[in-house]
Each structure stands twice: as C-alpha cells, then as structure tokens.
C-alpha cells in the first residue's frame, strides 16, 4: 500500500499533522509513505518509520512548485492521498482514495479539523520520531543528575514574543532554591538564522549560565532534547508544538494568536493567555506572575499523568 501525505510548510502545522500520520501508520501497518512538506518542516518527518520519500517544497512564482511536485508523483499509483494543503495536486494524481482538507480558517482546534478529515475520534495527538543518535546527542547536552528547564523565546512573528526580561526572571525563579526546579539547568532553544538569534540573545545575555542551543541542532535532535525536559516554556511556535509532542510538560504563551485553534496539545500541555480578548492580546500584557503560577499548576497536573 502506498500513501501520499501532503503536509505543511511551517513546523508547527507539520508537528500537529503527525498525529494523523501516526494513526494512518497504525491503521495500515503494511503501508509505505511519501511525505510532501516545506523544506524547513522536513526534519519533523525525517525519522518516521516506513518512509519511502521525503519531498521538500521549494516555492516558485505562480505556484510552479506544484507542477514540479506533480512531475515527481504522477508516475505512481497511490492507494491514498491525504492533502492538508488543499492544493489541486491531489485531484491530478491517480489514487484509489483521496482526503483533502477544506481550505480557509474555521473555528476549533487544528487537531479537530485534521481528525475530521479521516473521521477519527478523539483527535490523535502529535508524536515525534527520533533515532538513537538523536537521543545520544540530547543526553550528552542535557545529562542526567538534575532537571532541565527549556525555554523557547523565539517565534516567527515579533508580536508573539514574550519580553526577554520576563523569560529570564521566570527561569531564575523556577530554578531558585525555593523554586519548582531548584538547581535545574536552563537550556534555550531556537531555530537557525539571524532573526531567531536576535530574539534569543537578550535572554541568553540575562542568563549567562544557560546552555545556548539556538540554531545548533536539527529538528530530530531538538525533539530528543525536548523529550528530556522537565518543562518547556515558550512562545506560540513550532518549538512549542514539538515540546508537547515530545511529552514534556509544555506551557505555551499566547497573546495575538488564538490558543483555542493552535494551543499546545497533550495531557501535559497548557496555554497561558495575555490580558484582552482571546487571540487579540499583547504579549506585554502577560504578567510573569501568571506564567509562574501556571507553571506550578502544570507540574502538579503532569505528575498525575501516567508515564
């Protein structure tokens, strides 16, 4: 059986789609998969089992990239095409069955929309795939012996970024002798590129003892690092979704984006909202004290979740 899975360009959306993909793998244990996704999101799928091909979409003018992708896929007879991009390509391929998500924005969480595409209830939660070498790298970076608080102070939009000084002060409080994680190590994650580095630099400067992992790991290694975290606290970003998928207690910080649509998903994941109407708040209006109390509550909640 051959399944074509057309996922997203952005890391966060790609991570959210892994639950649906994991469901397909369980439902069709004999199937082989081809994944089409954005270049940046490719690392989300690189380690998945039964992967035949991973095709990166490099955008072209006039959407000519889809013509190139079609050329790579048209000679295969597919058993199922799942298209999460609502592109025309799924209609132009030979397949026994196709599932194409409806375009446009709709109320409700993205996971619910994805699950409805295949009629799955409850919505399958995102997962991560890593290799032993990824776990070994993570273990070397975040050795056992003390807990690790991982911060994600970056985002793809400056308005989604919580003030750097609040990240730093929160980390110091959580790792203080009377904090939730006394003596814990602090690691700071972010993607490659100058923008990510510039967002993370003020936090790194304020926390000179922190482990700087910004732009230094690929996505499977990042996932393995997050799987070792005692807690992840970060802005609404792909890292936040990856942390929740990795099983880390995850606190997502939300202001101008709707947490009811894109909040972190999982039994140990929560969103903390800034003041103002949902999805219309300013990150400056998210008090540090609110995040601190949410972190304490989440740790208590996570302790009740079966391993």
What are these regions (language model features)?
Residues 1-307:
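Catalytic machinery of carbohydrate-active enzymes
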């Amino acid at each position: 059986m051959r399944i074509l899975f057309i996922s997203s360009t952005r890391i966060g959306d790609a991570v959210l789609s892994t639950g649906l993909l994991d469901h397909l793998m369980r439902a069709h244990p004999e199937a082989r998969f081809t994944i089409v996704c954005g270049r940046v999101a490719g690392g989300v799928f690189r380690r998945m089992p039964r992967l035949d091909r991973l095709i990166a979409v490099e955008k072209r003018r006039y959407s000519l990239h889809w013509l190139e992708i079609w050329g790579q896929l048209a000679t295969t007879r597919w058993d199922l095409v799942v298209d999460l991009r609502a592109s025309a390509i799924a209609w132009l391929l030979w397949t026994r069955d196709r599932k194409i998500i409806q375009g446009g924005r709709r109320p409700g969480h993205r996971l619910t929309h994805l699950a409805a595409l295949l009629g799955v209830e409850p919505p399958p939660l995102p997962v991560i795939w890593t290799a032993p070498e990824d776990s070994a790298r993570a273990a070397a970076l975040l050795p056992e012996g003390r807990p690790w608080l991982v911060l994600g102070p970056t985002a793809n939009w400056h308005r989604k970024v919580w003030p750097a000084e609040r990240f730093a002060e929160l980390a110091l409080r959580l790792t203080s002798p009377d904090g939730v994680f006394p003596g814990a190590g602090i690691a700071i994650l972010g993607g490659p590129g100058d923008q990510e580095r510039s967002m993370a630099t003020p936090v790194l400067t304020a926390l000179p003892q922190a482990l700087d992992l910004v732009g230094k790991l690929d996505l499977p290694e990042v996932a393995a690092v997050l799987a070792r975290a005692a807690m992840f606290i970060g802005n609404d970003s792909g890292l936040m979704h990856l942390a929740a998928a990795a099983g880390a207690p995850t606190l997502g910080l939300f202001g101008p984006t709707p947490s009811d649509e894109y909040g972190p998903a999982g039994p140990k994941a929560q969103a903390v909202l800034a003041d103002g109407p949902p999805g219309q708040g300013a990150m400056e209006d998210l008090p540090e004290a609110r995040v601190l109390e949410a972190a304490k509550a989440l740790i208590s909640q996570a302790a009740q979740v079966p391993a």
